[in-house]
């Protein structure tokens, strides 16, 4: 609103007219989205570029890889290997990528290739841990629905939505450069946990990797993740369990054994407490709606 505010008869209303931007223009780059993949992969998933690439490599494009859960590995042409755990984000230049594959039981990720419409300051090769992964997971689900809509205006909204998310990730990466050593220690531990969810971790085991007391580890986890170490580890195992149950051929007992739960009863109880339904319900739904877990880029 410009000019003067009209007077109001409401006594407790505080009038204001604050110029949030007035002295200069702000120009923000958009993106041209080349491809967007939502991949849920098992241990057989491996992609080699350019052999398996559906579209030609574009020199000025970028690849953003957002790992939802599990573990994946990207091999660059210079021999560098990048291991990705859920939840994390990384930006890479597609011309640098040699291959990528699932490292472990499952790798769920969003793989997006895009070109900025103007200058975009993107940190290349820098991994950032995403603590509020549920928010991004939901937003990317919305993007997937919009981008597959037959309505062009919804496709445009999907790309605008994705541009907003990309800028959030870039801002997060620049903030990461200023983070304290304690947060780096927790992120390193979180990466280790996600890489070995089949292992039975006690809070004492986790604290020993820092090293610190169990009480101090609890305080750090609550500060950075909003969960205790035990809650975080259990949630990560249950999220992976849900994905494994969606894979055809995995029984409830096999998933419980794979993720080192005491037995199927304790696994089912924890699963239902988190998701609100029994693990057997996932198997029934998967049998009715089989999905392809290995799309290629």
UniProtKB/Swiss-Prot annotation:
Keywords noted in UniProt: DNA-binding, Transcription, Transcription regulation
Pfam families listed in its UniProt record: AraC_binding (PF02311), HTH_18 (PF12833)
Cysteines engaged in disulfide bonds, as pairs: none
Domain (HTH araC/xylS-type): residue spans on this chain: 187-285
Record-level Gene Ontology MF annotations: DNA-binding transcription factor activity; sequence-specific DNA binding
InterPro entries to which the protein is assigned, alphabetical: AraC-bd (IPR003313), Homeodomain-like_sf (IPR009057), HTH-like (IPR037923), HTH_AraC (IPR018060), HTH_AraC-typ_CS (IPR018062)
DNA-binding region: 204-225, 252-275
Name this protein carries in UniProt: Uncharacterized HTH-type transcriptional regulator YidL
Organism: Escherichia coli (strain K12)
Gene of this entry: yidL
């Amino acid at each position: 609103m410009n000019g003067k505010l009209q007077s109001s008869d409401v006594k407790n209303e505080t009038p204001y007219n604050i110029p949030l931007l007035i002295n200069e223009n702000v120009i923000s780059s958009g993106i041209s989205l080349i491809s967007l993949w939502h991949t849920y992969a098992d241990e057989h998933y491996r992609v080699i570029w350019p052999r398996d690439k559906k579209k030609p490599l574009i020199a000025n494009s970028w690849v953003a890889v957002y790992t939802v859960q599990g573990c994946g590995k990207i091999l660059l042409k210079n021999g560098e290997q990048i291991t990705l755990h859920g939840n994390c984000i990384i930006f890479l230049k597609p011309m640098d990528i040699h291959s990528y594959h699932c490292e472990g039981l499952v790798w769920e990720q969003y793989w997006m290739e895009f070109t900025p419409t103007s200058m975009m300051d993107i940190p290349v090769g820098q991994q950032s841990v995403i603590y509020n992964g549920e928010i991004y997971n939901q937003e990317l689900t919305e993007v997937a629905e919009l981008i597959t809509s037959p309505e062009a205006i919804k496709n445009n909204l999907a790309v605008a939505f994705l541009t907003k998310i990309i800028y959030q990730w870039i801002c997060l990466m620049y903030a990461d450069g200023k983070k304290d050593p304690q947060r780096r220690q927790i992120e390193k531990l979180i990466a280790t946990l996600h890489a070995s969810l089949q292992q039975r971790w006690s809070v004492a085991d986790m604290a020993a990797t820092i090293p610190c007391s169990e009480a101090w580890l609890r305080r750090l986890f609550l500060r950075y993740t909003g969960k205790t170490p035990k809650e975080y580890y259990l949630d990560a195992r249950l999220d992976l369990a849900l994905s494994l149950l969606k894979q055809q051929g995995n029984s409830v007992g096999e998933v419980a054994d794979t993720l080192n739960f005491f037995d199927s009863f304790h696994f089912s109880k924890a699963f239902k407490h988190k998701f609100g339904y029994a693990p057997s319900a996932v198997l029934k739904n998967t049998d009715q709606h089989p999905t392809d877990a290995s799309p290629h880029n």
